[in-house]
Amino acid sequence: MGIRRIATALVAASLLLSAAPAAANFHIMRIVQVYAGDASHPDAQYVVLQMCIAGQNVLGGHDLGFFDAAGAAIGTPVVFAGSVANDASQSRVLVATSSAEALFGLTADLRMPAYISPPGGKLCFEPGVSPVDCVGWGNYSALPDASIGTPYDAGVGLPVGSAVQRDLSFDGGTSTLECTVDNDDTDDSAADFDPTIPNPGNNAGASGVVDPDHIFFYAFESGSSGGWSVVVP
């Protein structure tokens, strides 16, 4: 009987050890940029994920979910069919609409419908009881919500033609995403994100090219709110 117990314990330990890498090969990444389209291309939307450490590319079966201002799901989550190739630390993953692919000349790693509602909403990587990461904005009202804290630009939302980007300065640096010991994620969207010119990037390392007919410029600032607007000649 003692031998059986030892054997059972060894099997259990082996299963735990083999499961450990699988539990850590996709979730150490964060949402770093969100774009909700512009006046001429309202469906040109995208979300950029970024890996904090190497080896976070096993995305098959994992998903991105979208929510309206009341916290209700919009459509069904978009699901990765498999892993992405580049697993280096700081690698990006692009989830985008076909309109965004065309506008920025970039191939998405996962195609999404235009589910982002600029006035208010939330999106999560791995939505569920314990999402990996979320961002909320505007008049999102399903509060309190520990996954987003205070929405980004509450009452204003995502400015047309502007992207919002995670502030990487919380850990003391400005160019490297940290989400382990030093952390660029405070779980408060108002604190974590700032407006920026759209600059999507995909897992292949390509960056979006802004259409020459689009001019992005800083348009307004009011208190903590600000944004970029778009002029299409």
Segments (PLM) and residue ranges:
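Bacterial N-terminal signal peptides
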Residues: A9-S18
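Residues within well-ordered beta-strands of beta-sheet-rich folds
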Residues: R30, Y46-Q50, G65-F67, L94-A96, ...
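A structural motif detector for short, solvent-exposed N-terminal "entry" segments of globular domains
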Residues: P21-G71, P212
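Intrinsically disordered, low-complexity Pro/Gly/Ser/Thr-rich segments with frequent PxxP/GP/PP motifs
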Residues: P77-L103
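Bacterial N-terminal signal peptides that target proteins for export
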Residues: M1-L10
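Extracellular carbohydrate-recognition regions
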Residues: D213-G226
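Surface-exposed loop/edge segments in extracytoplasmic proteins
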Residues: G71-V78, V129-C134
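Conserved beta-structured recognition patch
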Residues: G60-G61, D109-N203
